[in-house]
Amino acid sequence: MLAALFEPIRIVFAFFESLVVTIGFLFVGGGQFVAPGDYLTQLNRTGIFDNRAQDAIPQTQVHDIVLEFFEGDHGGRSPKCLLIGYDGARADALINTKDDPNAGTQLLKADGGAIYNMYTGGSPRFINRQDTSTAPGWMTMVTGKWANEKDGTGHGVNNNDPSKPADGPKVIFTELLEKQLARKTHYIVSWNKHFNGENATYVNDIKYCADNNLAAAWTDTDSDKETFGLTLAEVMDPDGADMVMCILEYCDSAGHGNTFSNTEPKYVQAIKDSERDAAALIAAVKARENYENEDWLIIITADHGGVFTGHGPQFAGCRQIFLAANKKVLGGVLESTLPPIVD
């Protein structure tokens, strides 16, 4: 009842925020603000993406892609997934690595996959709005829901402050384990707000998995170096988790500390560092002793972009992100890249 009463207020607020954004595009210079249409055109001209920026896929589809993959036919192979997150990586950040064949995203494309324009922040903006921030972005990916959904099934994490309610939609890790599609899952992060504290984003998911004896591991570290190392060890372990997700903070840290811009050397280096770590993880997957008998879905994506030294509003530079995968997944339809099994 209260939600229904406050809904018109939220829509009006979102409208005025959008108006402020538009005014900012018109009056603020310096290259950080670009009119939405111009920014999308710039993304299209990069030659990086397999879909138009105007046709960006919603962030919600990541969950559906992963679930569909595990539920699909793997030709007798064991399904496994590695999801690598670049926190705070704008879509146009990939300009800095598009000519590097050893960059993580380029390796996935070379394996028969693709790189897609994707968006965060809710759709449509006035109805399903959520901050273009860390907690809402990743939560949308692992639940397949925006924070606010008309039917009341949203995950409720509008910004970085709240926990997902205990009665909210289940995260992909829980779903895979309960459906017996995965034996073990492991979620590894460098930002402790995900898992630590009374208001941790996933506190109720962690409790649910523990109460129900589900083999879900949740690990936070003190640095991206440690997150990378733990993820590498998990991927190299013959008995490691079937679903592994890690989040690297290089880009977000560089953006907040300097600026979210390709003219900022530290931000450029951050995307290169992310791509380097991703490439090493991809190599580790392919080096697994049982790799030929496994079917791996590997995804690299981001939770949000940024402008100046922040994010959260509905700026195009904050909303437009990307999804790279070793399989073509546009529209949530997986195209297998598996070679036939040779006896």
Identify the residue ranges that each predicted region occupies.
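Membrane- and interface-active hydrophobic/amphipathic segments that mediate membrane binding, fusion
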Residues: 1-36
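Active-site nucleophile/metal-coordination loop of metallo-enzymes that catalyze phosphate/sulfate
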Residues: 37-78, 90-180
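Loop/turn elements at helix/coil->beta-strand transitions in domains of secreted/extracellular proteins
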Residues: 77-82, 111-116, 179-186, 238-246, ...
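Metal-dependent active-site segment of extracytoplasmic phospho-/sulfohydrolases and closely related
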Residues: 81-83, 91, 101-109, 273-315, ...
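Solvent-exposed loop/turn segments at secondary-structure junctions
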Residues: 87-92, 122-126, 131-133, 146-148, ...
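Substrate-binding rim/cap in mid-to-C-terminal beta-strand-loop elements of soluble/periplasmic
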Residues: 136-144, 313-343
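Catalytic-site neighborhoods of secreted/periplasmic enzymes
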Residues: 148-220
